[in-house]
Amino acid sequence: METATLVTISISCLLVSFTGYALYTAFGQPSKQLRDPFEDHED
């Protein structure tokens, strides 16, 4: 394979992995540990 193809595939895999991890952190099991500043604020 050519170098450009390998670089493109590597960057694409990295981007998909990062997006999947971000979605898992935002909506998956770790999201229960996140605090909501709007709920913490009292009027």
Curated annotation (Swiss-Prot):
It comes from the Eukaryota. The keyword Repressor does not apply. This is Protein PsbN. Keywords: Chloroplast, Membrane, Plastid, Thylakoid, Transmembrane, Transmembrane helix. It comes from Pinus thunbergii. The lineage of its organism: Eukaryota, Viridiplantae, Streptophyta, Embryophyta, Tracheophyta. InterPro entries: PSII_PsbN. GO terms for cellular component: chloroplast thylakoid membrane. GO terms for biological process: photosynthesis. May play a role in photosystem I and II biogenesis. The chain crosses the membrane at residues 5-27. It is found in: Plastid, Chloroplast thylakoid membrane. It is a single-pass membrane protein. Coiled coil: none annotated. Belongs to the PsbN family.
